[in-house]
């Protein structure tokens, strides 16, 4: 058998966070909200370095594709002249 606080506390917390907290945040000073947000909604402080890798890959693709694109345009212009 589950104790009653184990059932009611999560339900009450969900109701508070969903319906009551947005109204409370409207009346709090913004400085308090910025102080409380990291405590109430913690996030991982580790930064993911994927952005740098993606930018490097895009630069490599651009350099590869730019030479290929020039070659294809030359070929298409030659074929148009031949026709």
Curated annotation (Swiss-Prot):
Q: Where is this region: Disordered?
A: 51-83
Where composition is biased (Low complexity), the residues are: 67-76
The signal peptide annotation in the UniProt record is none
Protein family per UniProt = Belongs to the UPF0729 family.
Protein name from the UniProt record = UPF0729 protein CBG02799
Organism for this UniProt entry:
Caenorhabditis briggsae
């Amino acid at each position: 058998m589950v104790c009653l606080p184990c059932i009611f506390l999560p339900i009450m917390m969900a109701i508070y966070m969903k319906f009551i907290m947005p109204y409370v945040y409207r009346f709090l000073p913004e400085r308090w909200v910025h102080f409380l947000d990291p405590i109430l909604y913690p996030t991982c402080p580790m930064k993911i370095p994927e952005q740098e890798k993606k930018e490097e890959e895009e630069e490599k693709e651009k350099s590869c594709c730019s030479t290929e694109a020039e070659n294809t345009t030359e070929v298409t212009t030659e074929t148009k002249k031949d026709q």
